[in-house]
């Protein structure tokens, strides 16, 4: 979990100035500005980059609020507002946002079908009647035609639809002649086609009416079925088999929901993507809902509450949870205690479709829509999902307003007819198909000093390639360190990338098992020459960043693959015994911006470390010169004193003893030195040895 940064007033002023001068996103276009701002504010690069992202989210949320729209997921719950005013507010929001929307092909119409009329549980019937009357009046009013729309399109958008929807007790709503259209300015998805799930908040003491509208000739229709449930009562149990839910009459399903409609209500906001060119679904009366043979796993879609003040806490909480969420089939939300069950079944009711448990999804077998069981997510069977222009307009993207909570642990594969747009993979971690600018949260390996020494020893022995050339060395070091081979490959790839960024040539790989005979000789030489330890320490300290395994960047992954292929060709003779294709090499990727950030921080760290080592070397050299000078003075004094003693020159001896070097003046001459004893002992031992030899 990252710690929060507290900025001074001067730093905030500098950050704001850079933001106004174009530092408005986290892409490579603003990389230089972010770097300059980090240097000027004396902050870390990642801190400034995080500030830019937070600033974007704040400005996006602020613009959405100023334009008249409420944040996604919020509902008007003030008890003093009458139901008529509440419905009127919904229409005002719809008009204000529809006028300001760009109405491009990537930002389709969103139909508001959930009308929240707060009232006490005792006055629920009266508020229902008032809301129905006000809703009928609203439908009679005309909706202003949007610019750029022809008469035919306008009429097709507002086809009269009347539908009686069975909902909770005393909460049926008749939809009149007109529809309410709301175009969301803050898009739900980023340009990376992600699918999100949202958390739900419970709002007590408010009655909920729900209408479901499906209009033809539109690629996407979003509706909000609002489900009333009793907070204290027992949860509704979903049927074990979807066939029971699909063939049962709607009356029984409505009756099954009646026990949960007497007290506090829970508002759930669900968005569905409906089909464009298929006939409308018939809901209500005695007509059974159309059975769809959906084969596929479930996918929960939910939205956050849109509370900007709570964004940081949620982001940090999700970051800490990221490595732990693996295959949860159900989880509990702390605020509302909502249990999401990971089963292949769903209730059929207002605003719901029927799902059947299976494994594959066939678009031709799903004429209307596909429902993923745990929530109401309808994927269009014939809607083309373009990668360049996605479902929602990403101009005013509020990325952090929505929090992905994928609870499906099965394999998901969605295919459309037009573009064959596919989402495949094991969706157990919510960030696998998250925002494109958000890197996948992956486990990092913390190496100890001994592990690093072992890895560097194998690296110096030729373990410098990700291909099959170094397969034996990789397996050997993985077994020695008791880690997975992929972790070792990741470390090798990171070290290769660091060498390239620092301009150092990567040593050529060598095949076969590791041979440390040359390195043992080098170690013995370095032990005999301790003066070379300073140079080796610089090389060791340069690798301090290898303690954390960092994934490869997108920009270098292709280059890594090319280098692997080149190494495969160079060492083809060595690999005849155990050939392995380069396609089997796993390369973990992160964003280019993170690799740039890491490279710059590494270069700065290396330069500062090099300066420190140079200062240290200069200090040691000065100390050595001083010691040499002292040694020369002592040598001269000793030679002069010995000559004076041999010549029995008393005056010279007195002159030398009166002018002792500073080192000798500090010595204590009161105690007898052990040196004469040692000398006499050595002389006596030598004489005894000579005597024994003569005998």
Swiss-Prot record:
Task: Spell out the SMART domains in the cross-references.
Answer: HOX
Q: Name one GO cellular component term.
A: nucleus
Xref: InterPro entries: HD, Homeodomain-like_sf, POU_domain_TF
Output one GO MF annotation. Answer: DNA-binding transcription factor activity, RNA polymerase II-specific
What keywords tag this UniProt record? DNA-binding, Homeobox, Nucleus, Repeat
Can you say where in the cell this protein is located? Nucleus
**Full protein name:** Highly divergent homeobox
